Design a protein with these regions (language model features):
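Sec-dependent N-terminal signal peptides
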Residues: 4-13
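Beta-propeller folds
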Residues: 17-175
Length: 175
């Protein structure tokens, strides 16, 4: 019983000694938020990762934490690798629609050839996704589904019945 009382007193004293004032300013300013790295992607080789930085998308080694090279130069808001990591979808610009949805302008860079292709002729799209073979990218414009063949640049419309706040093809929505 004596040990329990001493332990309880110790915990109370430690709590008082290390107490911090919690304020709304600290909560909303991110004071208590953990530090992290945004825009990081682990590469399939298991030895490297990519990070978005001011100079572009930079490749680093896990083992040495040293820069291995720059995959794409320039400023981008975000990026996504194709499944085989042969291409990168680069988000250049965004325009919010609702709380979690946005329109964006995207380019696709072929990492082997260095060729850059603008998605949808440089116009805004939603939800772009690579095909499994990275030969095409599907996307949504005005609630209709499209895909673009990356080799030819040809854009094919899949649906035609999209309608704002009514028929929303290719985008998840609240019911």
């Amino acid at each position: 019983m004596k040990k329990l009382l001493i332990s309880a007193c110790f915990l109370v004293m430690a709590n008082i000694a290390f107490a911090q004032e919690i304020t709304l300013d600290k909560i909303y300013s991110g004071y208590y938020r953990g530090k992290g790295i945004s825009g990081i992607a682990s590469l399939k080789d298991g030895e490297n990762y990519a990070v978005i930085e001011r100079e572009g998308i930079v490749k680093y080694s896990y083992k040495t934490t040293q820069k291995v090279g720059t995959l794409v130069e320039g400023g981008f808001e975000s990026y996504t690798f194709s499944d085989d990591e042969s291409k990168i979808l680069l988000q250049k610009e965004s325009e919010p629609i609702y709380r979690h949805s946005f329109l964006g302008k995207f380019d696709v860079k072929d990492l082997k050839s260095g060729k850059i292709i603008s998605l949808n002729n440089g116009n805004f799209v939603q939800e772009p996704k690579f095909s499994p073979d990275a030969a095409k990218v599907a996307f949504v414009v005005d609630n209709n589904l499209y895909y673009q063949d990356l080799a030819s640049g040809k854009i094919t419309q899949i649906t035609t019945d999209g309608k704002k706040n009514s028929i929303i093809n290719g985008i998840g929505d609240w019911v």
